[in-house]
């Protein structure tokens, strides 16, 4: 396993890129089947989901649209619990199937807030599509239809996920080494 140091923390490889890409394709295949005959709007949550969204879209072969919003609930390695919308949604989602593309569902607080916000715009359906899910850390009930990989309650970085804005460019996913 390789290690990387970001700022004052050391991380080691936990999910290699090849495994990530295999799981992303499996999720895309399910979405293609589930939304056949529909034109969903993929709503990617920046900054963390940019790599996942890009790789996912390469395998989506149904008609679709993609847009982006930006929410923040992290500072360093802990969730602040404060969620603010930085970039809003401009598309009319009334009557549309919306697939929220997220890098990770941790406590679920950010996703719950997002579902509440989007629900006021009367979509036909809201669907959660996350690269990573920490089932042991969920504090709110969520119907997560598409979770590519379940992980333990560790702090991770890479493949779009950051530690204080660094490490997003790493191809693999790394776990914080507890020393």
Predicted regions and their residues:
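PRPP-associated nucleotide enzymes
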Residues: 1-179
